[in-house]
């Protein structure tokens, strides 16, 4: 399977380079990207996608890894130009403060939320068949203070507790049933690895909460010159199937384990700002 993926991706990249008329390396530019690392290798898909994008544009990627940073520090570094690029859920506020690359990059997986819950609590969630049922549970989602999901949950009438500072404290607070920390919504592309790292929690087996938003890349304003290059190249990668191949490479196994197609879908309204 990996050999097929590599062959398909390589062929797709060659086609992009050919179609784009980039056979000459005379115009190749060295694109320097300083990017943060995330715990548990969660950055790998996004780094590989950026590498493909720069190469597909006919340029040479020079990727500098800036080390591990929490999200609030990544945000500050992007605003100051200390790092070049990162991925966030797209919002108008972020669009105004940074330079958006307006190409969705996870196939919507990040907007499809599955719950981490304390062990032994599955029967509580088995009663849920609709958004109204979920609201009536009275359970509070545990979320990072500045996260977009806070706005999504509140818009849909779902109670929230926010964690200031290090959001990773949420795991043990949910496991310990700290008041207000009843469950932790995670992206379908994140939750399997997180559950393995936190065996005191379990993956809720019935529900999937879905809202219409995806990650996009954001550049610091100091690196706005890369916007057109990356936007056009990511569109080519998406159209060629390379992005889908990468998504399958990193997350197909997780989707199978999660029994994605058998879950009860609860659709959530999405804030406009």
Provide a role label for each language-model segment.
Residues 28-99, 230:
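Extracytoplasmic small-molecule ligand-binding "clamshell" domains
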Residues 29-43, 128-146, 182:
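Short loop->beta-strand "edge-of-pocket" segments that line small-molecule binding or catalytic clefts
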Residues 49-62, 129-135, 145-168, 195-200:
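Ligand-binding cleft/hinge of the Venus flytrap
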Residues 52-56, 67-84, 155-156, 168-190:
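Short helices/loops that flank or line small-molecule/ion binding pockets
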Residues 67-135, 145:
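Acidic, polar ligand-binding/catalytic clefts
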Residues 77-80, 86-98, 180-202, 207-209:
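A ligand-binding cleft/hinge motif common to bilobed small-molecule-binding domains
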Residues 109-114, 121, 196-231, 253-273:
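Periplasmic-binding protein-like
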Residues 144-155, 234-273:
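Ligand-binding clefts/hinges and TM-proximal coupling segments of bilobed small-molecule sensing domains
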């Amino acid at each position: 399977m990996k050999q097929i993926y590599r062959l398909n991706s390589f062929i797709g990249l060659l086609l992009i380079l050919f179609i784009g008329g980039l056979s000459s390396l005379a115009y190749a530019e060295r694109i320097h990207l300083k990017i943060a690392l995330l715990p548990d290798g969660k950055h790998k898909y996004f780094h590989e996608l950026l590498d493909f994008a720069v190469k597909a544009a006919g340029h040479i990627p020079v990727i500098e890894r800036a080390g591990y940073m929490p999200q609030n520090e990544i945000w500050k570094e992007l605003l100051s130009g200390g790092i070049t690029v990162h991925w966030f859920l797209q919002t108008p506020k972020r669009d105004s403060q940074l330079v958006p690359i307006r190409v969705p990059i996870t196939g919507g997986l990040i907007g499809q939320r599955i719950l981490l819950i304390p062990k032994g609590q599955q029967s509580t969630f088995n009663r849920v068949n609709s958004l109204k049922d979920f609201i009536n549970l009275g359970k509070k989602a545990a979320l990072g203070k500045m996260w977009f999901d806070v706005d999504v949950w509140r818009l849909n009438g779902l109670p929230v507790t926010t964690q200031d500072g290090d959001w990773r404290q949420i795991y043990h607070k949910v496991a310990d049933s700290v008041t207000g920390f009843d469950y932790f919504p995670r992206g379908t592309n994140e939750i399997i690895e997180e559950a393995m790292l936190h065996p005191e929690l379990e993956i809720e087996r019935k529900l999937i909460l879905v809202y219409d938003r995806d990650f996009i890349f954001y550049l610091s304003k100091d690196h706005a010159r890369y916007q057109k290059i990356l936007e056009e190249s990511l569109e080519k990668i998406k159209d060629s199937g390379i992005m889908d191949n990468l998504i399958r490479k990193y997350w197909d196994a997780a989707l199978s384990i999660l029994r994605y197609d058998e879950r009860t879908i609860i659709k959530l309204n999405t804030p406009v700002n």
